[in-house]
Amino acid sequence: MQQNEPPPQAMQPASPTQLPAALVREFDGEHLEARLADAVHLSTVGEDGWPHGAQLSAGEILAVNATTLLIAIWPQSSTTANLARDGRLTLSLVHDGALLEIRARSHAVAQRQTALGLSVFRVEIESVIEHRAKYAEVLSGVTFRLYEPAQVLSRWREQIAMLRTFA
C-alpha cells in the first residue's frame, strides 16, 4: 500500500445479519455444476482455543434463507467435534469483489446421513461483514480441481437432496 492510499476497510453490506440475495441463490443447491471448483472457508474454534480451518464445497452447503444455512460435514472431523462442543463458526468467501466474513452459531440436527455418514448442522447467521478495499477487488478465493467431477457431482446432488429434508 502506498502512503497516499486509504487503508482497506471493513464495510457492512446492505443487511449486516443476512446473506446477500445473490449468495442465497448461489447456495440454493441448484446449479452445482457451475460451482465445481469453488470452496467456502470454514473456521471453527479448536479445543485448544486456536482457529481450525476447513473447506466446504457447493455440495455441502444449502441456504434455507438469508439467515439460515445447512451444512453437511464429515462425522469424525475436528470441525464436527468443534461445532458440537462450541457451535461458533466463521465462513469466508469472495463475493462481488470483496471478502465476506460470515459469523454464525450452529447446532447439530442429524448424524449418519447419506452413505458417507455425514453430520448435518443448522447454521444461524449472526453477522455478515464485507471487507472491501477502495484500491482493489478480490477476484477469487479457495478453488480446487475435482479428479472425478461426474462422480462427485452425483454425490453432491444426493447430499443437497438430503439437506433439503432438514430445511
Where are these regions (language model features)?
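Binding-site signature for planar aromatic cofactors or substrates
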Residues: 1-167
